[in-house]
UniProtKB/Swiss-Prot annotation:
This is Multifunctional CCA protein. Its cofactor is Mg(2+); Ni(2+). Belongs to the tRNA nucleotidyltransferase/poly(A) polymerase family. Bacterial CCA-adding enzyme type 1 subfamily. It comes from Escherichia coli (strain SMS-3-5 / SECEC). It catalyses: a tRNA precursor + 2 CTP + ATP = a tRNA with a 3' CCA end + 3 diphosphate; a tRNA with a 3' CCA end + 2 CTP + ATP = a tRNA with a 3' CCACCA end + 3 diphosphate. ATP binds at residues 8, 11, 91, 137, 140. NCBIfam families: PRK10885.1. CDD domains: HDc, NT_ClassII-CCAase. The gene is cca. The keyword Signal does not apply. GO terms for biological process: RNA repair; tRNA 3'-terminal CCA addition.
Amino acid sequence: MKIYLVGGAVRDALLGLPVKDRDWVVVGSTPQEMLDAGYQQVGRDFPVFLHPQTHEEYALARTERKSGSGYTGFTCYAAPDVTLEDDLKRRDLTINALAQDDNGEIIDPYNGLGDLQNRLLRHVSPAFGEDPLRVLRVARFAARYAHLGFRIADETLALMREMTHAGELEHLTPERVWKETESALTTRNPQVFFQVLRDCGALRVLFPEIDALFGVPAPARWHPEIDTGIHTLMTLSMAAMLSPQVDVRFATLCHDLGKGLTPPELWPRHHGHGPAGVKLVEQLCQRLRVPNEIRDLARLVAEFHDLIHTFPMLNPKTIVKLFDSIDAWRKPQRVEQLALTSEADVRGRTGFESADYPQGRWLREAWEVAQSVPTKAVVEAGFKGVEIREELTRRRIAAVASWKEQRCPKPD
């Protein structure tokens, strides 16, 4: 029996990145030997075991053979005669097909070290094309390691295109698509994930609402980058700098979906694109089964981001109504989330990357003023039932009006 550290732990250690999870491959053993040694079996379809002390995963070396459609249609073979090289060959990328023995020696049968050095994401073998989930995984790796200068090998991108055009991605379940997307949204450069999907044709298949934005012009005066698809990826990049939250990043990604519905004869104007985009947000989220909390913020951002851009022109009543509309009294975090997504929208434009966004500050200040109006004082003043809410709203409007007079500049 020989045990090797494999995959991501080896890769990230070589890149000088923190190692989170360690996975091991066991060569020359059987399930019974593992159980006799005190390991606990957890894999139903293939033999994976938990170490009795560390609870890290130890898998018997195995091969996989395509036996059906999609990413689940595989038959596994695990036996003592399966070599380490056999096991590593079934992995997706060469940089993930590295192993380390107990002496610290690196085993590299597929030139993963060379590809690490050259910052290349390259598939190990043609078997890559049998698993459509790998298209999303490679896009996610491209986003995860973009800051280190990684790029996808030309032949791998070509294979991803072939898989997409062959309809392989249609076998992916919504849950898996969202899981990979959510993971990509946590990376330093989530926009790269969507750019890669576009480069291989997968964006049109999985995110048609986003793909439809490319080639749609916006007024050059406000959008020097002109193309709404490019603007969308720029805003996502900016959102990633402003917030680590998936909610904020996803909402930013979806903020301009309504522009994809504008008839070409009305271009480059997009009046009413915010409310129009709400239905597309709902459509996308329903299809991918996006969690409700993430979906709800994306809907609100689509509907209200342009309103926040015009904050100095809003009257106090409209400002308080905005807080009502986003349910800020019960979910105060939404004020900050809306401020960040709106800022990402403004700064996600060519030449505006370092622009100030005072509207975000004013939104936060107005919220602090509105929420500081005490409910208790209204009740103690003798108001009852529905009168309490009406009086509370009236006092909040008055407080915001007073603040606006002193702190928020009047529009020209």
